[in-house]
Each structure stands twice: as structure tokens, then as C-alpha cells.
């Protein structure tokens, strides 16, 4: 099976089932170093440990990202999503409203960094332990 198809299925599955420990275990198994999620387009750029770059094209309509930055809203959205109180779509809509343009997940260090459209770092979280780092 094509790598892109495998990763698309993994991302679809974690969005539906919210089984985050399985998801990060699979990313590590496939030697993924980072992935970058772009909220406006739903595109995902995957970078492997051997510097291979894969692009997963988004399937939903474009999402408007606010220029107003609200780190407190980002923290709240992340906590609600991790505990299963919001869907992936709701999570993305809330983040876009809080000024998040993209997030970068460092799979090895279990960190996710949220950035505004001007590349301002808005928030960092520990994705393994579900807690804020800034």
C-alpha cells in the first residue's frame, strides 16, 4: 500500500476514534520525526527520520484563520479535544478562531507547537502527558 494512503488512513482513524496513544505509537513505528498540520487547508506535511517529506492533501473546505491571537482559547480547545469533549472539526474551528494557522508535532519529543499566520509561537503542549508547556 502507498505510504500516503497508509498515513491518510491513520489520520482519519485517530480523528474518529481519538485513540492518541495508538496514533503516536504508529507514527514512531513508521519513523515519523515531525508532522505539520495546516488548519486553513487541512493539509498535512509529514517528515520522516530520513528526511523524506510526504504531503497529505486535505479533504474538507477551506477554514478561515483569525488574525486575533488567543493562547488561552488554544489551551482550552486542546484540553477539550484530548478528553473527548470535542470532535476534530470543532477542535480545528476553535483553533482557527484563536489565531492558529498551523501546528508542528515533534513525535520524538512529544511536543506540539501552535503557530499564528505570522509565525508567532502561540502555545506548546506535551502531547504524551496532555499538559501545557507554555
Swiss-Prot record:
It comes from the Bacteria. InterPro entries: DUF1398, YdfO-like_sf. It holds the Pfam family DUF1398. To E.coli YbcV and YdfO. This is Uncharacterized protein YcgX. It comes from Escherichia coli (strain K12). The lineage of its organism: Bacteria, Pseudomonadati, Pseudomonadota, Gammaproteobacteria, Enterobacterales. The gene is ycgX.
